[in-house]
Curated annotation (Swiss-Prot):
The encoding gene: ZSCAN10
Domain SCAN box: 56-126
CC per GO annotation: nucleoplasm; nucleus
Pfam families: SCAN, zf-C2H2
Cell compartments where the protein resides: Nucleus
Protein name: Zinc finger and SCAN domain-containing protein 10
Function: Embryonic stem (ES) cell-specific transcription factor required to maintain ES cell pluripotency. Can both activate and /or repress expression of target genes, depending on the context. Specifically binds the 5'-[GA]CGCNNGCG[CT]-3' DNA consensus sequence. Regulates expression of POU5F1/OCT4, ZSCAN4 and ALYREF/THOC4.
Post-translational note: Methylated at Gln-483 by N6AMT1.
Length: 780
């Protein structure tokens, strides 16, 4: 227990600067106590330096400790995990080596993970400054001390933030457990400049009779053995050594105490801006330097600890050119505002070595670039994600779940952000207007795409468009092939095809292949094909594995990509979102619309060298050239029949599988092809879209119209369909189907067989007539 010599207000006297700062923050009209608005770093200092006082009693002392601890840890705002992290962080910083603790200055440390990442980044540096000496002359380390004493041959004047304050200096010495710190010797005061500390006159008394003695008494009277904080003794002794030199009159009313080294909370900067003549060091509060009187007779000079701040330099001579050997200056540097991060210390990724100034950016980089950190795996396609919420959104692409519905039109979306963008289309006025043509857009991205069209000069300036008019779909055209795109990003992806073809034709050396491999780092191990993005490689791998993770719930058909499933589902729903702005014809796919737009006078840069026919796309030209060469690369695995196009093969395979995906809504009749379904629907609606301009007669099919036009042809006029001649007998036919039926007579082929008796026929109609005999049905 402490003796009665310990004053009752020792706690308030020792940290009077801190309390005065808090009293300044609270206005005189505020009825609340200053302690009720303590910042965490202030409450932390009061909590650590609290001393038991006889007049308060044990219950009041315990209550005071609880109050200070509550202001420091803030259990109403922080969770148990956060409070534990604050305690662990404080202890972790106290056990760090001095040279590592010095490198952490200026960093807003919030948890132990940030400290670990910063220390790992320091160890990875090829070369860094040597360790700084933080040990006092007794050999005790004080890594968390806010006060260090340094003895040099001369003292210097350092500008401070408070005008004309007086402080006595104290000679540093090693204090034993029973020694009492020496009293400061009175010296002649010298006039000091504004903003500097000067030595006090001998008439002033210190704040307390001896903080060092108080701490020693606490240590001697403690019945609990060693302190749980090994650094408390050295730190508190140094703090008491400086506080002992301060008098209550020396504490300015508007003094701002340095922020706590742990960086808890943020300090409001003072209204008065402090001007410092020295260059700033770290953003942490630079430790207080006390220049001891090394020139005084009879006092041996002893080396002491250096300053923590790397930017703090030893002070030089005064303004008059003479060394201030007869006075001592206490240098107090205040951290201004929130600590600024040190640009030399950054968060480094342990996998690739990329550095980031913030921890949040490092975590986002690890989730995006390193799949090992993506612990949430999709069981359908094998794609991994860093968060469960992203996996939940991704699963909706497989299940086609669309929980967000528009209350105006009923359109459904997978994500709420997509619904928010869609709701902008229902608003009365557009939010973004084009400054050149006045056209309005609901989304900023649409306006940016529209402005790119103006910049490219691909089309003339458009007039302001009313809301009822549909916006044109194509904004950007490819200068190589004339293909149109709605987005500039799609055009950029398309231009890579031309660039790849050009590189392949121009250079075949190893250098060009090396450059192409650099642009396409993701290579397929089966076929060697390279891709620019990893997701493209994942989608390509399904071609080799045969995996089709996206299935249609209506017909059960599966696809390798989700975009293919979305396009396929429009077959069942009948949705055709892409309409031609000129003729109004609608299409299921955007590519079909782009192909259709070429029929309205679009550019056709690709020409056939044999017949001169022109095409708008290279794939259309390649498909047409197979009609000249007779090439049929697509073959049926069942019957071996060849086809020039994969679409024709898919249509043919439905004959073997019996699949008829297209059903009539009126009678339920099913068809293999959508064209047959469209032709059948005309029998219900009575539509006859093909009309003869000569007699006005209309037909359901275009073939019927062409056959009818042959009846109007004059003897010298060329018929709509030239006559078909048989190469065997020379017989001619007006229709190609009749010629094919006639050729069966010469070949003797009978492709239609009866499954019951095995009899074969040359025509399908003959087989149908024969089947009625088995069913005992007659036509007449």
């Amino acid at each position: 227990m402490l003796g009665e010599s310990v004053p009752a207000a020792v706690e308030q006297e020792q940290l009077g600067e801190v309390k005065l700062e808090e009293e300044e923050a609270v206005s005189p009209e505020d009825p609340r106590r200053p302690e009720s608005r303590l910042r965490p770093e202030v409450a932390h200092q009061l909590f650590r330096c609290f001393q038991y006082q006889e007049d308060m009693g044990p219950r009041a002392s315990l209550s005071r400790l609880r109050e200070l601890c509550g202001h420091w840890l803030r259990p109403a705002l922080h969770t148990k995990k956060q409070i534990l992290e604050l305690l662990v962080l404080e202890q972790f910083l106290s056990v760090l080596p001095p040279h590592l603790l010095g490198r952490l200055q200026g960093q807003p440390l919030r948890d132990g993970e940030e400290v670990v990442l910063l220390l790992e980044g320091i160890h990875r540096e090829p070369s860094h400054a040597g360790p700084l000496d933080f040990s006092c002359n007794a050999g005790k380390s004080c890594p968390r001390a806010d006060v260090t004493l340094e003895e040099k041959g001369c003292a210097s004047q350092v500008p401070s933030h408070s005008p004309k304050k007086e402080l006595p200096a104290e000679e540093p010495s090693v204090l034993g457990p029973s020694d009492e710190p020496p009293r400061p010797q009175p010296r002649a005061a010298q006039p000091a400049e504004p903003g500097q500390w000067r030595l006090p006159p001998s008439s002033k008394q210190p704040l307390s009779p001896g903080p060092q003695k108080t701490f020693q008494a606490l240590q001697e009277s403690s019945p609990q053995g060693p302190s749980p904080w090994p650094e408390e003794s050295s730190r508190d002794q140094e703090l008491a050594a400086v506080l002992e030199c301060l008098t209550f009159e020396d504490v300015p009313e508007n003094k701002a105490w340095p922020a706590h080294p742990l960086g808890f909370g943020s300090r409001t900067p003072d209204k008065e801006e402090f001007k410092q003549e020295e260059p700033k060091g770290a953003a942490w509060p630079t430790p207080i330097l006390a220049e001891s009187q090394a020139d005084s007779p009879g006092v041996p000079g002893e080396p002491c600890a250096q300053s923590l701040g790397r930017g703090a330099a030893a002070s030089g001579p005064g303004e008059d050119g003479s060394l201030l050997g007869s006075s001592e200056i206490l240098e107090v540097k205040v951290a201004e505002g929130v600590p600024e991060p040190n640009p030399e210390l950054q968060f480094i990724c342990a996998d690739c070595g990329v550095s980031f100034p913030q921890l949040s950016r490092l975590k986002a980089h690890q989730l995006r670039s390193h799949p090992a950190g993506r612990s949430f795996l999709c069981l359908c396609c094998g794609k991994s994600f860093g968060r469960s919420s992203i996996l939940k959104l991704h699963m909706r692409t497989h299940t086609d779940e669309r929980p967000h519905a528009c209350h105006l039109c009923g359109h459904r979306f997978r994500q709420s952000s997509h619904l928010s963008k869609h709701l902008l289309t229902h608003s009365s006025e557009p939010a973004f207007l084009c400054a050149e043509c006045g056209r309005g857009f609901q989304r900023r991205a649409s306006l940016v795409q529209h402005l790119l069209a103006h910049a490219q000069d691909q089309k003339p300036p458009c007039a302001p468009e009313s809301k009822a008019e549909a916006p044109p779909l194509t904004d950007v055209l490819c200068s190589h092939c004339g293909q149109s795109f709605q987005r500039r990003s799609s055009l950029k992806r398309h231009l890579r095809i031309h660039a790849r073809d050009k590189d392949r034709r121009s250079s075949e050396g190893s250098g060009s292949r090396r450059r192409d491999s650099d642009r396409r780092p993701f290579v397929c191990s089966d076929c060697g094909k390279a891709f620019r993005r990893s997701e493209h490689l994942v989608a390509h791998r399904r071609v080799h594995t045969g995996e089709r993770p996206f299935s249609c719930q209506a017909c059960g058909r599966s696809f390798t990509q989700s975009s293919q499933l979305v396009s396929h589902q429009r077959v069942h729903t009948g949705e055709k979102p892409y309409a031609c702005p000129q003729c109004g014809k609608r299409f299921v796919r955007r590519a079909s619309l782009a192909r259709h737009l070429l029929t309205h006078g679009g550019p056709r840069p690709h020409h056939c060298t044999q017949c001169g026919k022109s095409f708008g796309q290279t794939q259309d030209l390649a498909r047409h050239q197979r009609s000249h060469t007779g090439e049929k690369p697509c073959r049926c695995s069942e019957c071996g029949e060849g086809f020039s196009q994969s679409a024709h093969l898919a249509r043919h395979q439905r004959i073997h599988t019996g699949e008829k995906p297209h059903a009539c809504d009126t009678c339920g009749h099913r068809f293999r092809n959508s064209s047959n379904l469209a032709r059948h629907r005309r029998s219900h609606t009575g539509e006859r879209p093909y009309s003869c301009q000569t007699c006005g007669r209309s037909f359901r099919r275009n073939a019927h119209l062409r056959r009818h036009l042959a009846t109007h042809a004059e003897p010298g006029q060329e018929q709509a369909e030239p006559p078909q001649e048989c190469v065997e007998c020379g017989k001619s036919f007006s229709r190609s189907c009749n010629l094919l039926r006639h050729l069966l007579v010469h070949t003797g082929a009978r492709p239609y067989s009866c499954t019951q008796c095995g009899r074969s026929f040359s025509r399908n109609s003959h087989l149908l007539r024969h089947l009625r005999t088995h069913a005992r049905e007659t036509l007449y």
